[in-house]
Amino acid sequence: IRKSVFAFNLPSVDLINYEADDLIATYVNQILKIGAKVTIVSSDKDLMQLYKKNVRIYDPMKNKFISQEDIDKKFGVKPEKIIDVQALAGDSSDNVPGVPGIGVKTAAELINYYGDLETLLKNAKKIKQNKRRETLIENKQKAIISKKLVTLKKDVPVKVPYSDFIPKHIDKKKLYNFLRDM
């Protein structure tokens, strides 16, 4: 991937202690502030929390743009509530503990009813199902930590300005050699 970035004369950015998702979220935030539109090319579900007006996501594995309907099917909530669902359901592939026994479907029902994780946790004592109520109360800190883990950072101290990502003159020979060697 890095070779392809250089072949197209684009910058490659990495920063110690930050994940690529956080760098992407930071650049998306900066670009939206100037009123431009953003297209993210990734199949990473964690980036779906960035989906909104002027931000679209293209999934190269599925060869399609992600829609609001796709997000509803996957998470059962609007994009801005994805982090609340992920905080409850957890994600073993990202080492997010979540709340034991709560999956995406139940998490979506709870978030759609209570609005967000914080309101749900404040009202956990009112939940009628004994086991669910007790599990949420016992695992409150896990849920709070999980939300911090899944929330993308949008203020990473990046040194490469977003303007460097505007396509520039492409060295045709360098690009040709890259494509030939693939």
Predicted regions and their residues:
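Extended two-metal-dependent nuclease catalytic cores across DNA- and RNA-processing enzymes
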Residues: 1-159
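Short, contiguous strand/loop micro-motifs
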Residues: 162-163
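Long, highly charged low-complexity segments
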Residues: 173-182
